[in-house]
Every structure is written in C-alpha cells, then in structure tokens.
C-alpha cells in the first residue's frame, strides 16, 4: 500500500477511536421519552400497532459470518456472490460468505464523521458485470478541511450557539453521491466521480433505469422550529432550503426529463419528493414497482411511505412524533395537513429504522412478499406482512440477540443477511 494511503487508513482508525469516545454517552439519554406522552391517533385503522401475524415465522438459524467490521452501514452483493460492505469510518471492504474480510479498498473519497453523517450506502450498478461501476453515499469534509470526527458535544454546541442565519448556511460537510469503477482485483476504486451533492442516504435502482437517492433534513438535529419560534415552515422554504427529500437521477448523474419539478426554477431539478426527515431505508416493491421509503421520526413517529412524484410528506410541519424535548412538532403537533401525504404505517415509540428488504426468495416461502425492516433502537428485525399497500401484521424477530440491526439484504441463494452496529455480518437460513 502506498505511503499516502497508509497514512489515510491510519488516520481513519484513529478517527474510530475518537468517535467511540465521543458517543460513549448516548444522546438519547438526554432526551425525553416517547413513552412518557400519549400516542398519536392514527389517520385510519391499521396505520400503527398492527397485530401479530396469524402464523409465526418458521424456525430459522442465525450464523455469524464475520464479526470484525467497524460500524458497518450497508451491504451489496456482487454478481459472483461476494459482498461490498461500507463502514461509517470511510472504508469499503470486500467480504464473502466463507468469512473472508479484505483490507479497505483504496480510493474511497475522504469522509467526515459528524453525528449520523459518515460513509453510508454502497450499491452495485445493474450492469456491473459489464461496467464494474459502484455507487456510494458519503459526507465529505468542506473544502480546505481534513477528514475525521467532529465530536458530538462540539457539534451540538456549535449548532445551538449559532443564529438562525448561521444555521441556514452552516457547512459542516458536503452530502454526496459518488460513482467509481471497482478494479479487476477488487482492491481499488478507479475514475471516482461526484454525481450529485445534497443527499447521502440510501440508493435504489428503479425499473426504468433511473436511480433514487434519499436525503435527510439538514436541520433535523435541532428540530423545528430550529429558530426557537416553534412555528410552521412554508412549502417553498422547505423545497428551497431543506435536503429532506428523495431525488431521481440517471445513472450518469443527468436529470430525467419527466422529473416532477422541472418547471419550477427555484427547486432543484433532481427533486422527486420532499418533506422527509431522515429516510435511511428504501426499496422498490417488486409487485408494484413503487418506491417505498422508511424514515426516522423525531421522538417517535418513524414512518413507512410510498413515494409519489412531487409528493410532500409533511416534515417539518407534520409528524406522528414530538420534538426531542417533548414539545409538539411545529407548535401544533399536527399529524395531518392538506396537501401532504400520510404514511401507510408508523411506529410510536420509535424503532430507529435503517435498511429494508422486500423478500422474494425461495428459502423462506412463508416470508415471500413480506417487508423486513432493520430496527436499531428496537434491536430487532421487524417483519411486516402486507396486503397490497397496507400493513396487516407485524412481528419482531431476533430481539433476544440485543443487537442494533443496521442493514438487511437478501442473498443470491435466498438467505437473509444482516449487519449489526457492533460489527457482525449475520445469516438467516431455515432450521432443518
């Protein structure tokens, strides 16, 4: 490994140690608890607290394939069955089902680690066998700054001391979508490009060849009203100033000609939907071809949304959650508003969802068509049974493992693979 890359890896390992120290006291411990407040009323029956399924899940076994990742975030399968795994500290590694675990792939852009921001998703181009392209989302340091960790106490302190104007222009880093070619020996990224700025959560390839990327609200850490007035924010302001949105681009970074806001010059043309808070999970429903997005609420109010082009999903004026101090959202506590879309399902208290999966495999025929959600705060794999676009049953699996589950994927053989925050890659297969 060249000297410069050795230094970079060493610096990122040092950042790991610094981040662990920075987050040793959970932020949640300083907040109110959703359980201390009455739950919100759903807009329709079955929108929350679905009953257990009539049939419990079949017996399955859980195997630990690897247990040495450093805060993994995402998993993507290569055509040969190997995997790419992203780690929050700026690494992408190759892994395999036999426990192989590579050194970090060289050439990954510098990453800044700030609260929830870091290296996030990694995705394989649908034509990878021909072009070897991969995509990834990450948080880059601002121009002139070195990569590394911004400790939480410093970050939150800087935010709260800032004025309204300063918060709107505060640049703690650059949210980016990157694309690169994976070298033939799988040791380096080549021809690294920045496809898009402003979003950096989940990547999903659409059936029409375009790609969706989800982005979080840049003000989510200090909640509306972030200026202390606790008031509603107008839709034009949300579209101009907030990054809580789903974007749609072509795989080369160009803008599809049928995107919904192309005729509005004040709106970024890649915008597909808006009013999102922190959508860390997204997947295409294989039955309908629609994009489903799972997003974090504030204090309670995590949501499952079906995305409509041009749709407003309510944040920061509408939510089934509360501000972190327990106050109503936007001063009203509204859970519905004319012109905004309702989630098809929500959780209260929150589960802290991340990766999602529509199961289509043959190993678990009982699970076919079910939606699986990686629950971090819930420390469970959550199974949702669907009837069309409605959730009719919910089951929580693996709670006995007491693991923050970060991502869930289906393997080529139909097994289910999970990443946990403490560095494990787990595999679920039927118990015989």
Residue ranges of model-derived segments:
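Blade-level signature of beta-propeller repeat domains, shared across WD40, Kelch, NHL, RCC1
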Residues: 407-432
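Beta-propeller domain segments
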Residues: 31-56, 117-119, 127-129, 140-167, ...
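Surface loop/turn motifs at the tips and blade-to-blade linkers of beta-strand repeat domains
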Residues: 64-69, 106-114, 194-198, 263, ...
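Asp-box/WD-like beta-propeller blade repeats and closely related beta-sheet repeat scaffolds
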Residues: 147-205
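Beta-strand-rich domains and repeat architectures in extracellular enzymes and scaffolds
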Residues: 64-90, 352-358
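Beta-propeller domains
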Residues: 84-106
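Blade-loop segments of beta-propeller domains
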Residues: 101-124
């Amino acid at each position: 490994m060249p000297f410069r890359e050795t230094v970079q890896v060493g610096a990122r390992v040092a950042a790991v140690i610094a981040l662990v120290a920075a987050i040793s006291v959970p932020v949640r411990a300083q907040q109110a608890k959703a359980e201390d407040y009455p739950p919100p009323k759903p807009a329709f029956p079955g929108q929350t607290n679905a009953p257990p399924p009539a049939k419990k899940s079949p017996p399955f076994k859980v195997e630990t394939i690897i247990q040495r990742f450093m805060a993994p975030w995402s998993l993507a399968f290569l055509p040969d069955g190997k995997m790419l795994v992203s780690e929050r500290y700026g690494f992408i590694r190759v892994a395999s089902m036999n426990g192989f675990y590579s050194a970090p792939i060289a050439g990954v852009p510098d990453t800044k680690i700030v609260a929830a921001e870091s290296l996030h998703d990694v995705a394989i181009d649908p034509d990878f066998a021909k072009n070897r392209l991969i995509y990834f989302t990450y948080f880059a340091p601002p121009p002139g700054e070195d990569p590394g960790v911004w400790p939480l106490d410093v970050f939150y302190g800087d935010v709260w001391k800032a004025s309204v104007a300063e918060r709107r222009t505060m640049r703690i880093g650059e949210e980016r979508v990157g694309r690169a070619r994976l070298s033939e020996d799988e040791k380096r990224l080549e021809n690294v490009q920045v496809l898009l700025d402003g979003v950096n959560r989940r990547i999903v390839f659409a059936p029409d060849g375009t790609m969706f990327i989800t982005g979080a609200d840049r003000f989510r850490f200090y909640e509306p009203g972030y200026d202390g007035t606790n008031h509603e924010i107008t839709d034009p302001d949300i579209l101009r100033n907030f990054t809580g949105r789903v974007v749609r681009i072509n795989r080369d970074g160009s803008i599809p000609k049928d995107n919904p806001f192309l005729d509005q010059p004040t709106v970024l043309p890649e915008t597909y939907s808006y009013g999102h808070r922190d959508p860390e999970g997204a997947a295409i429903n294989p039955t309908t071809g629609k994009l489903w997005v799972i997003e974090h609420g504030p204090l309670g109010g995590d949501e499952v949304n079906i995305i409509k082009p041009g749709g407003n999903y309510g944040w920061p004026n509408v939510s089934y959650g509360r501000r972190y101090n327990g106050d109503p959202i936007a001063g009203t506590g509204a859970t519905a508003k004319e012109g905004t879309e309702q989630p098809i399902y929500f959780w209260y208290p929150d589960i802290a969802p991340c990766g999602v999966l529509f199961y289509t495999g043959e190993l678990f025929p009982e699970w076919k068509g079910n939606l699986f959600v990686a629950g971090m705060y819930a420390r469970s794999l959550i199974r949702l049974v669907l009837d069309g676009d409605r959730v009719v049953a919910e089951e929580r699996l693996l709670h006995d493992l007491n693991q923050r589950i970060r991502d869930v994927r289906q393997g080529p053989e139909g097994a289910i693979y999970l990443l946990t925050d403490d560095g494990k890659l787990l595999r679920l297969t039927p118990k015989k």
